[in-house]
Amino acid sequence: MASNPVFTRIDKQIKAGGYAGFDRQSAAPRMGRRRGVQDTLNAEQLADLYNQPAAGPVQTGRLTLYDVVMKTLGLFAVVVVVGAASWFVVADPERAGLSLPLMLGGMLGSLAIGLVIAFKKTISVPLIVLYAVLEGVFVGAISSVFERMFPGVVTTAVIATVSTFAGMFLAWKLGIIKVTDKSRRIFGMAIMGYLLFSLANVVASFMGVGGTWGFGGKNSLLGIGISVLGVGLASYSLAIDFDSVDRAVAARLPEKYSWLLAHGLIVSLVWLYLEILRLLARLRE
């Protein structure tokens, strides 16, 4: 089981044999056309066709790592731009009251859209972009609130997130951190438990438990331990995401799946940032 339903869905298709059937179905008509064309081509023309390089992934509409990287950067840019706008809206003391509506709207909206994306049978690019917009609204608003409470914490969280992302990629690439079917299953169960706890924690925080910090309070050892666990889970989620992208490229899935993979990476990256932000804020106290 992957870190989120997006990669779970892709992994199931890879295990089912990818799109080998797609290759066979599309190959037959091409072969038929080629035989028909050969009747009218001379030897020189046939030699030219034979000497041409084989079609690559781009020409055949296959998924490439470049596709995933570029779409991930595009969605990341949307999150950053919208997040910056949301930040400046609530940074003004006169508009500080908008912080909670923006955070709730962004959080609940992105949760709803994320579930639709994960379980929708077709890939919807507009929904994926809309999710990035809502994530930007939420991240910008909550970052501005944390920055007012703990000056400099956002910059530290951004640097820590980027460093963790790079470190996890290198550790996965070098084989230091491995992703196996067993680790995916264990991680999937851990994620479900942590998700249920997080939802209960959000409700508890709105009820004033732990001084609006939820279970564990602001700076108790329990609260810090919960945040460390969240950072650890989000970090390993990235390793699973990297592995899923690598398997999807190897399985030669259609190019349209690059949007779904990019979306999954953004989900994990934003999750990691939020967990690090909460951990740093707790350590400040």
What name fits each language-model region?
Residues 1-285:
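A hydrophobic alpha-helical transmembrane-helix feature that marks the membrane cores
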